């Protein structure tokens, strides 16, 4: 009997037998991968990259941004919403967020009256950090010393706020696609009296791995990726940049120190210099991928501060996550909807393919290359 004449159960059994007989190729066949850091799975469906795109196309990014706009509340000398005037800063500038999500003096909600309606106190502070006085630059277009100043400021604010709060979250939302309406180069710093959900998952996962294997999870992971090489994007004397085996976003990367470091303030001067150079190279590659100012959300995760310092945090390894949404071009992004919201994360492009595309990109910014060409043409 031909398969077309078989009943549905026979056809399913035949299909499963064919699948088992085929040679698995991660670049061609769907599979799920485990994220040991955040204890979750991602569905990888590489064959979907062949499908035509008929979904939403984002508008082209604004080509020019004024270097200084007196009405921009992040510019030097500008007046912010609360009436305060920014100083004429020429480097980094840290100030209290005028519309904070966390405040230090919120009242205690008291005990919950039912286990299904738990409420706990949430206190903290929110700050904004400008990277540069000019609105028309981004981190990849800044100099290495300027980026080093940002890293020093990150370390300082982590130490300062960490003296009072166990979790200090540094994060940057770059581009309107990631909800950033102000093009001025800046990040945010939220410190809280509680560990957020993702920090709690990373705490549990790293503690469990350390208990079972006697070494930090991410330190061992970095060593393994250096041996395997296929997901590496950049390596330097002190840092590793890779597309994680379990990456969810198309060109997601993980930035890791080579040695065991728990928190940003622990980085040596040499490691900070190297980090500045590595960040510039990575973010230049991002911009060069689709020749656009590449949007992303990024942030640092390190061992909790305050009472959770010392030997109890030996399982932690400092790291930065970069989550860029672009998938096929400067105007086609990945959406986290439907299956991702109701079941689990899913991606099309494999992490290995993404790493290869980033790895081969030049480390000179396309804007600078274009300017050189224009200069040569008019010479």
Swiss-Prot record:
Annotated GO MF terms: D-glucose binding; galactose binding; UDP-glucose:hexose-1-phosphate uridylyltransferase activity; zinc ion binding
Enzyme class: transferase
UniProt pathway: Carbohydrate metabolism; galactose metabolism
Cofactors (names): Zn(2+)
Binding annotation for UDP-alpha-D-glucose: 81, 97-98, 173, 188, 334-337, 339-340
The record's free-text note on cofactor binding: Binds 2 zinc ions per subunit.
Record: residues binding Zn(2+) 2: 202, 301, 319, 321
Entry-linked PROSITE patterns: GAL_P_UDP_TRANSF_I
Region described as Disordered: 1-20
Matching Pfam families: GalP_UDP_tr_C, GalP_UDP_transf
Keywords in alphabetical order: Carbohydrate metabolism, Galactose metabolism, Metal-binding, Nucleotidyltransferase, Transferase, Zinc
Any Gene Ontology CC annotation: Golgi apparatus
Residues of the active site: 186
UniProt cross-references to CDD domains, sorted A to Z: GalT (cd00608)
Segments of skewed composition (Polar residues): 1-15
EC number: 2.7.7.12
GO biological process: galactose catabolic process via UDP-galactose, Leloir pathway; galactose metabolic process; glycolytic process from galactose; UDP-alpha-D-glucose catabolic process; UDP-alpha-D-glucose metabolic process
Assembly behavior: Homodimer.
Function, as annotated: Plays an important role in galactose metabolism.
NCBIfam families assigned: galT_1, PRK11720.1
Family to which the UniProt record says this protein belongs: Belongs to the galactose-1-phosphate uridylyltransferase type 1 family.
Protein name: Galactose-1-phosphate uridylyltransferase
UniProt gene name: Galt
């Amino acid at each position: 009997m031909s398969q077309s004449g078989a009943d549905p159960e026979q056809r399913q059994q035949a299909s499963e037998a064919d699948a088992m007989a085929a040679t698995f190729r991660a670049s061609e066949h769907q599979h799920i991968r485990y994220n040991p850091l955040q204890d979750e799975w991602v569905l990888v469906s590489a064959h979907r990259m062949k499908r035509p795109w008929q979904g939403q196309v984002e508008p082209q990014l604004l080509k020019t941004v004024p270097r200084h706009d007196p009405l921009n509340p992040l510019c030097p000398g500008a007046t912010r919403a609360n009436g305060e005037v920014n100083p004429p800063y020429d480097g980094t500038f840290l100030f209290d967020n005028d519309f904070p999500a966390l405040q230090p003096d919120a009242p205690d909600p008291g005990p919950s009256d039912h286990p299904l309606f738990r409420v706990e106190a949430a206190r903290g502070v929110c700050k904004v950090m400008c990277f540069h006085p000019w609105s028309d630059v981004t981190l990849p277009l800044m100099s290495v010393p300027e980026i080093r100043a940002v890293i020093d400021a990150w370390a300082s604010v982590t130490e300062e706020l960490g003296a009072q709060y166990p979790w200090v979250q540094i994060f940057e939302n770059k581009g309107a696609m990631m909800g950033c309406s102000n093009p001025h180069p800046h990040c945010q710093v939220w410190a809280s009296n509680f560990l957020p959900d993702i920090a709690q998952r990373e705490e549990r996962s790293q503690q469990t791995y350390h208990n079972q294997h006697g070494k930090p999870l991410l330190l061992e992971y970095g060593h393994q990726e250096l041996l395997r090489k296929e997901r590496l994007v950049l390596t330097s004397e002190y840092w590793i940049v890779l597309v994680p085996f379990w990456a969810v976003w198309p060109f997601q990367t993980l930035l890791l120190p080579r040695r065991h470091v728990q928190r940003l303030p622990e980085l040596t001067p040499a490691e900070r210099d190297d980090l500045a150079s590595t960040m510039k190279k990575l973010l230049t590659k991002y911009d060069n991928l689709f020749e656009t100012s590449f949007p992303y959300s990024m942030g640092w995760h390190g061992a909790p501060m305050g009472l959770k310092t010392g030997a109890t945090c030996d399982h932690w390894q400092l790291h930065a996550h970069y989550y860029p949404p672009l998938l096929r071009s400067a105007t086609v992004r990945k959406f986290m909807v439907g299956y991702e919201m109701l079941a689990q994360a899913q991606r099309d492009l494999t992490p290995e393919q993404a790493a290869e595309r980033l790895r081969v990109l030049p480390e000179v910014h396309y804007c600078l290359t274009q300017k050189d060409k224009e200069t040569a043409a008019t010479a």
